[in-house]
Amino acid sequence: MKRIEVNVSRVIPASPAEVFEVWLDTKSPGGPWFGCERVILHAVVDGLFYHSGRHQGRVWAHYGRFVRLERPRLIEHTWMSEATRGIESTVTVTLEPKGQDTLLTLCHSDLPDDDLGRQHEEGWKFITGAIADRFGSRRRAG
């Protein structure tokens, strides 16, 4: 099966350290694990994660293993779900300072080249948007 790569970039109004912490905190509003029905996350190299959440009227389970954690600039983990056809893919998140903000760049590689694989782009745009909104509301209030 042919593979594709999805890339999403977004400027987040927070420091790389703040974004890194939110990415790995299951209880942090705006983070990728927040609001899931069930989350198990052991955020260390070779640590595993599982999360399930509702989307389009059904539950989707996701599994993976943390490959690299370089605080506060890089998070890399594998990603497997029904939407990857059970094949392990890789998510790499880089966090670069951009003035007082952070440029978050996400690369999701080895996705199947089909509708489910391509839908990951919209999912990651939603998640990175939620993180930006979380910090954007804080900055507006502060």
What is each residue range found by the language model?
Residues 22, 32, 52, 78, ...:
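Residues that scaffold the ATP/ADP-binding catalytic core of kinase and kinase-like folds
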Residues 24-25, 71, 136-137:
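Residues at helix-coil transition
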Residues 109-142:
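A conserved amphipathic terminal alpha-helix motif
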Residues 31, 39-44, 50, 55-99, ...:
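Hydrophobic-ligand binding "helix-grip"
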Residues 1-6, 17-21, 44-59:
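N-terminal short leaders/motifs
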Residues 1-38:
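Hydrophobic ligand-binding cavity/cleft-lining segments
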